[in-house]
Amino acid sequence: MLKNFMKNKKGAVGIGTLIIFIALVLVAAVAASVIINTAGKLQHKAAVVGQETTQQVASGLQVVKITGHSVDQYNLDKIAILVSPNIGDEIDLATTVVTFSTDDRKMSLLYDSSNASNGGKVRLSTANGTSDIFKYDDVYAIGAWPFEDPTYGQSDQDPNEKKFGIVVLQDMDNSVSGEHPTVNYGDKVLLAINIGNIVGENIGNRIRIQGEVVPEFGAPGIIDFTTPPVYANRVVALQ
């Protein structure tokens, strides 16, 4: 009888050990599941942050050149900013902001998407080029230059709106349209700014102008120039 009792006791101890072992396995499995889920979330977050960082570092716009249009020796009425995107993701110019500041004022300009279905404030010159980037082009409904132009015609733009238009110089995949003016690496466009109408008066001589062309994400293009003492020619290199 004693021998049978000892056998039963050993069996009970073995079952208890097995239960403890199973419990440990279950706890370890739950812990492993939590760790795996956490690692997955952290990996996803790291990938998103890495992608956003890449966009901020690699993407953006660079100001290649700035040219002005003078009406006489002392007055500048238009500015054309030649921009091109950096290597990186495409840039939507519809969400791009152009800032200007002088000694006594600062302004922010947005893309003029009015009448976008008919081309908006975009003039395409990629096919045949253009004889005059500052010319108001009524072939494209309103043309790239906002506001009234007494020389070449008129637009229905409200002078109180701070807007810019676009002249397309190079766009191999036709990504720049009135509704979605999107540029990618290799594209070149002019941001058409009728500065005289926006400010309310033409820009005089020896005026320091600073600003940025700020895309939705990525590095901004820098604007920094001083207008010359005299506008000797109708077309003036500013930066």
From Swiss-Prot:
N-linked glycans consist of the 779 Da trisaccharide beta-ManNAc(Thr)-(1-4)-beta-GlcNAc3NAcA-(1-3)-beta-GlcNAc. Keywords: Archaeal flagellum, Glycoprotein. One of its GO terms (molecular function) is structural molecule activity. The keyword Acetylation does not apply. One of its GO terms (biological process) is archaeal or bacterial-type flagellum-dependent cell motility. GO terms for cellular component: archaeal-type flagellum. It holds the Pfam family Arch_flagellin. Residues 1-11 form a propeptide. InterPro entries: Flagellin/pilin_N_arc, Flagellin_arc. Coiled coil: none annotated. Glycans are attached at N115, N128. It is found in: Archaeal flagellum. Flagellin is the subunit protein which polymerizes to form the filaments of archaeal flagella. Belongs to the archaeal flagellin family. PANTHER family: FLAGELLIN B1 (PTHR35903:SF1). This is Flagellin B3.
